Amino acid sequence: MPWNWQLPDWPHFTWDSPRLLRAETLFARQAGIVAGALAHLEPATRQTLLVDSMRDEALDTSAIEGELLDRASLQSSIRRHLGLQANRDAGPAEAGIAELMVALHHAPTRPLDHETLFAWHRLLMKAWQSRLSTGRYRSHPEPMQIVSGPDYKRRIHFEAPPSDCVEDEMTRLLAWLERTAVDGPSPLPPLARAGIAHLWFECIHPFEDGNGRIGRAIVEYLLVQSFGQPLMTGVAGSFLRQRKAYYRALEAASRRLDATDWLLWFAAATIEAARRSEDRIAFVLDKARLLRGVEARLNTRQMKALLRMFEAGPEDFIGGLSAANYRAITGTSTATATRDLSELVVLGALLRTGSGKGSRYHLAIPQRRVEPSLL
């Protein structure tokens, strides 16, 4: 069975627009909720949220490829590129993707072109410049294949167009993106445009390495471009949580030009990501309210533990904080941990579940769990 780029109608993707209409409506509504919530935050809080969002997007898009970055170094590097105070140096991998994240969220009106993609690739591959051809499309004569398994039982998941076709293929994709922009002659809704662009880019697989991360960067860039402001969408996190399904959806779409199934999957994942962004903003407001009510009555250990729980975000510590966790965070004794935690419950900062050694403590704010969007 041929790959989609070998079909006569390539690269003319088709999809069932009426089936995608509900998803576009849901996403536009969700994006509006997020944008409205961001607009009502204090500037410093909004800036912190944006930094955290870019940090998590960088961590997640890298984790999809099996690359683990240093969280603190990455956050510090993002702050530095935004002109904010930074308290530590970053390695080349963290520094490069940090600069890429800032570029994605601060130049949304600029059309994508070859040079922009080359610049992104150089940033992304900063730590591997001595081993890879960076900032240019691949040129090797060998087939570009995505494979798995040992040599004697290798499975080819995808084979991309030959290297000598890549520049022309990318020129067609970039021209399509310009035509389908909000102010272009053939504008497309945000999800259809970003979803097709991601699929099309991955089918070309134009770089020697880093195609998945660049492809997901394109998604973020196009969504920001569609709405004219950062949305903290965090699509990479949604893809990471459904990593196997993400790869299956891309692999299935690589055999056909009807992209309906791919777009429906992509839309559901992107809407889920937007809902998590709303949850994140609500968490920030909830924790601010909680702190205002108890801050003056906390000792330094209690404050340290609460701040650690806040730092973990709305999805961590869902199983609850244990006394052992508290001791590890604060370096205190068992008796002191028990007393501190009991006081936090009385103050209304924490809720306790279970009893004895099974006691678990939760922040006294709404626990929100976002389920995958069903379209």
Outline where the language-model segments fall.
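FIC/Doc superfamily catalytic core
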Residues: 1-375
